[in-house]
From Swiss-Prot:
Functional summary from the UniProt entry: Increases the formation of ribosomal termination complexes and stimulates activities of RF-1 and RF-2. It binds guanine nucleotides and has strong preference for UGA stop codons. It may interact directly with the ribosome. The stimulation of RF-1 and RF-2 is significantly reduced by GTP and GDP, but not by GMP.
Gene: prfC
Biological process (GO), any one: regulation of translational termination
Main location: cytoplasm
GO cellular component assignments: cytosol
Entry coiled-coil feature ranges: none
Species in which this protein is naturally found: Streptococcus pyogenes serotype M28 (strain MGAS6180)
Domain of life according to the entry: Bacteria
UniProt name for this protein: Peptide chain release factor 3
């Protein structure tokens, strides 16, 4: 098969949702259809000892939540599918946002009882900003939920995107009978031995069933007043196809997968800092690091840099340029993943995600190129932390482990590090409290370094240029610090302290990140 044909087979997408909407369960079912797991186990198997395939970190297994993005790959129906399962927990939005830079489409999982929740809305805004296609799976039809028309209306109003139902539920909860499949023009049956039936048989199958009569009325209304189906509108991110189903009972999931692969886009190009778009079908290899993860295998204390291949083909042992440093690197020890299990890979193409063993060479956002090509892709988003803690080693004899742990976890982007300009004291910044808990857990479990953490509360963060810097500007209400790149930064006690500073030093430019 030619390189172009290989690249056109790729489908790379992320699954996004609010916590507990069923995101990891649907991931399990997709892997089951891809033949990667023998049984799709329910995710929160804390008592049974069975854990989700994509929740590999110790703390994830204890809590039944995803706190890191997992990368999984399988072949299905002539396509090579790359799934990135992202953390649903709001504190880990940084990791999720960066992951969304590495995909060509997103699958949004919605709980039918709860509709569009806060985290879903937040993540959708990032996806919308990138204009990538969004496919919606409304989950948990095996339980009682809200009316389908109400859910579609909320989706359109809250997210500001047009929707088109690909199927429609016949009842829900205990009265759930199946799906009226508008796209494939058939009925998908929840009960009995037969999985499908023709629409012509519907009146006989569901004689005297008020839910089926309601479905026919709903569909008539949608056909008269609903949106027109358009493949181009889907690819432009203007229309989301909506699928109903139940991930837990594996109902409607395979139909979703088949239809998703029919309409999901091939790998797309990425913009460089100069505004050019790198074509995925170009023969020269290029890619960018969107995530770094330490200790995926605690026995080996390893670090993996996750690279999205943007163009061309990776071959084992190839030399690449690391644009940020201007130095070369050799990609000899490279893996692909099924959550924590992995296999060495000898070649991969645009659209694929590979893991490069890293001894500290790479940073999140790095661009890799070959030959004379030395461009950089657009930077990944960075986020301004909102809450802070001072951190120090509990045991002074463990300084080495403490520094190694902090360095690796900061390079992962799991937490942000600041040093007090005057005292050199370490301060950690996070988007939410759970990030601190995970940091402490990993420092103790993976680096054998107990830490003392002292809350500093919320701070308003602003960056300042070296030229404007005067250490006398610092006070107890605005702490002067350096970020991990040695850029000066002020941590203001509150918005009032920020305004007071701005009034006192009107010529000083204060910069805010996302």
């Amino acid at each position: 098969m030619s390189l172009t044909e290989e690249i056109k087979k790729r489908r790379t997408f992320a699954i996004i949702s609010h916590p507990d909407a069923g995101k990891t369960t649907i991931t399990e079912q997709l892997l089951y259809f891809g033949g990667e797991i023998r049984e799709a186990g329910t995710v929160k198997g804390k008592k049974s000892g069975t854990f989700a395939k994509s929740d590999w970190m110790d703390i994830e297994k204890q809590r039944g939540i995803s706190v890191t993005s997992s990368v999984m790959q399988f072949d299905y129906a002539g396509k090579r599918v790359n799934i990135l399962d992202t953390p649903g927990h709001e504190d880990f939005s940084e990791d999720t946002y960066r992951t969304l830079m590495a995909v060509d489409a997103a699958v949004m999982v919605v709980d039918s009882a709860k509709g569009i929740e806060a985290q879903t809305k937040k993540l959708f805004e990032v996806v919308k900003h990138r204009n990538i296609p969004v496919f919606t799976f409304i989950n948990k039809l095996d339980r009682d939920g809200r009316e389908p028309l109400e859910l579609l209306e909320e989706l359109e109003e809250v997210l500001g995107i047009a929707s088109y139902p690909m199927n429609w539920p016949i009842g829900m909860g205990r009265a759930f009978e199946g799906l009226y499949d508008l796209h494939n023009k058939r009925l998908e049956l929840y009960k009995g031995d037969e999985r499908f039936a023709s629409i012509e048989d519907g009146d006989q199958l569901f004689a005297n069933n008020p839910f089926y009569e309601q479905v026919k009325e709903d569909i008539e209304l949608l056909q008269e007043a609903g949106n027109v189906f358009s493949e181009q509108a889907i690819l432009d991110g203007d229309l989301t196809p909506v699928f109903f189903g139940s991930a837990l009972t594996n109902f409607g999931v395979q139909t979703f997968l088949d239809t998703f692969l029919e309409f999901a886009p091939e790998p797309h190009g990425h913009k460089t800092t100069e505004g050019n778009v790198v074509d995925p079908l170009a023969k020269d290899f290029s890619g960018f690091v969107f995530k770094i993860q330490a200790n995926m295998d605690p026995k080996h204390r390893d670090r993996i840099a996750f690279v999205r291949i943007v163009s061309g083909e990776f071959e084992r042992g190839m030399g690449v340029n690391l644009t940020r440093t201007g130095k070369g690197a050799k990609l000899s020890n490279v893996t692909q993943f099924m959550a924590e299990s992995r296999e060495n890979v000898t070649n991969a193409v645009a659209g694929d995600i590979i893991g490069v063993y890293d001894t500290g060479t790479y940073q999140v956002g790095d661009t890799l190129t070959v030959g004379k090509n030395k461009f950089e892709f657009e930077p990944l988003p960075t986020f301004t932390p909102e809450i802070f803690m001072k951190v120090s080693p509990k045991n002074v004899m463990k300084q080495k482990s403490f520094h190694k742990g902090i360095e690796q976890l900061v390079q992962e982007g799991a937490i942000q590090l600041y040093k007090n300009y005057q005292t050199g004291e370490y301060m950690l910044g996070a988007v939410g409290q759970l990030q601190f808990e995970v940091f402490k857990h990993r420092m103790e479990g993976e680096y054998n370094a107990e830490v003392v953490m002292t809350p500093m509360g919320k701070k308003t963060v602003r960056w300042i240029s070296e030229d404007d810097l005067d250490q006398r500007m610092s006070s107890s209400r605005n702490i002067l610090a350096k970020d991990r790149f040695d850029q000066p930064v002020f941590l203001f006690e509150n918005d009032f302290a920020l305004r007071w500073f701005a009034d006192k030093y009107p010529d000083v430019t204060l910069e805010e990140k996302m």
